[in-house]
């Protein structure tokens, strides 16, 4: 029996953070894609399937909440966890529409690995 590799998309305009996080997760056996903003995430979601997406809230071009709502229109079952380092009033729009989280920055690798254990 083969086990499926878990696919994660990290969406954050802080590319150093996103790439570091991707490297850590890849070292733990996850297949990781990185998107630089909400619009880039939407393009990834149109062409690929992910088991979970970690989405920053504050980003240029398209913020995380708008990206979440757009992705949910094309992939209603998408699991998207909102990440933020701030108290975000707009976050409630995403949470009430089914987003998971928020995952508050800074978070630990252990926090993420526990979150990923919920992926079936």
Predicted regions mapped to residue ranges:
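Two-component/phosphorelay signaling modules centered on CheY-like receiver
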Residues: 15-33
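Non-catalytic signal-transmission and effector/linker regions of two-component phosphorelay proteins
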Residues: 1-7, 110-120
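Alpha4 helix (beta4-alpha4-beta5 surface) of REC/receiver domains from two-component response regulators
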Residues: 66, 86-103, 114
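Receiver (REC) domain active-site loop signature in two-component systems and cognate sites
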Residues: 59
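Acidic catalytic/metal-coordinating carboxylates
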Residues: 36-40, 63-66
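Short amphipathic alpha-helix used as the core "switch/output" element in two-component signaling
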Residues: 43, 65-77
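Active-site residues of response regulator receiver
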Residues: 56
